[in-house]
Swiss-Prot record:
Key word NADP present: no
Subcellular location per the Swiss-Prot or TrEMBL entry: Cell membrane
Keyword Secreted among record annotations: no
Organism: Methanothermobacter thermautotrophicus (strain ATCC 29096 / DSM 1053 / JCM 10044 / NBRC 100330 / Delta H) (Methanobacterium thermoautotrophicum)
Protein name: Uncharacterized protein MTH_137
Amino acid sequence: MRSSVGEFMIYQVIGTVIGIAGIIVSFARFRESRTSPGGLLLWLILWVSVILFSLNPPFSTRIANLLGIGRGLDFLLIIGILGAYYLLFRIYLMVDRIQQDITELVHEIALREHDD
């Protein structure tokens, strides 16, 4: 039994709604200066891709075939894993920078307290 809404499968509706919500949130974060222009572009590409792959599932298979990957789902899983590793690396860099900032701040506070 296939769940559908009109002509669309339920996952297509959910994927499209999530993609549109992601676009709205991305623009809101950009307006609040919480995302850089490059970050906005990256998120827009991601959310538009979610919408495209949701509305046209064979599209992922065509891209997979162009890249020499067997199935569209395999392609999406590979992209998801690579994206997760990229985000993990970005988080690592952010934590490392924050750790350095905290170390410098603690050092400055210690020097000020020592001088007083």
